[in-house]
Amino acid sequence: YYVKRADFVACHNQSYVRQYDMVQEVKPGGTFLLNTGWTAEGLDTNLPGAMKRYIARNGIRLFTIDAVEIAHRVGLGSHINTVLQAAFFKISGLMPVEQALDYMKDAARKSYARKGDAVVASNVAAIEEGAQKCVEVAVPASWANAELDACASDEGLPAVVTNILRPVNAQKGDELPVSAFAGYEDGVIDMGLTAYEKRGIAVKTPTWKADACIQCNRCAFVCPHAAIRPYLVSEEEAAAAPAGFETAVLKGGKNLPEGMRFTIQVSQFDCTSCG
C-alpha cells in the first residue's frame, strides 16, 4: 500500500500540481518539495487554489529546486534523480546532511568509475548543487483563503471520460463505485481515449530541422507515444499556416503527389521528454 500520511512529499514534475492532489497526503507541519523553474510569483500564479489553501492552513513547509536546470548544467542531461535525492537529505533531516552527501558521492564514484572521471564529476556536482540550491519559500498568509479554481467542464465529453478516465488518471480510481463500470463488465473499453489524455508533462520537446531532414520518418516510427508525426500539406495549407510552421520540399523518388510539402509536427501535450 502507498503511504497515505507522509512527513515529506516531493513532486518531480511541476505539471503534476494540476493533475494530482500532490499535498493532500502531507501531514500537518510536513514538508513539500517541488521541482520547478517557477519563481515565488510564478508559484502564486500557477499553483492550484486548493493546494495553496492546504499548504497555508496545515503549516506545510514549501521548498523548490530547479533540478532540470541543474542536471543539464552539470552534464547529466535529463537525469534529475541524483539532484533531488541530495535535496531530500538536505531538507528532511533524516541524517546529518554532510554524512548523507558523502555516502552519495562514494556511491557515485563506485557506480560510475568505469564511465570515466567526467561522469563521476558530473554526479558529484549534481549532489552538491542539489543540497545547495533547494530554497524554502515563505508561504503567504493570503494562501489560506486562496481562490479555488473553476472545475473543468464535462460538456461534450463521453461518459466514459467523465466517469472513469478522468478519476483514474487523477489516481482516484479507488474512489469509483462499482456502478461506474456498468456496461463494461466484459472488460471492453471505448477506443480513441488518448485524445482526452493530454498530460503535458514534457520539460523539453524535440525541434524538427527541415534543412537536415532526409524524410525517413524514423523519428516518428520510434517515438513511443506517437508525439512525433509526419504530414503532407498542400501549398495552400502551408501558406495559410501560422508563423513558424516549417515545411520542406517532398523527397522520395518517383510518383510523388504533386503540390505537396513535407513537415514533421511534435505534440507537446503528448511528449514525455524521453530523449
Task: Give residue ranges: language-model regions.
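Ferredoxin-type iron-sulfur electron-transfer modules and their immediate structural context
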Residues: L101, A113-C274
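Active-site cofactor/cluster-binding pocket
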Residues: Y1-A170, A238-A243
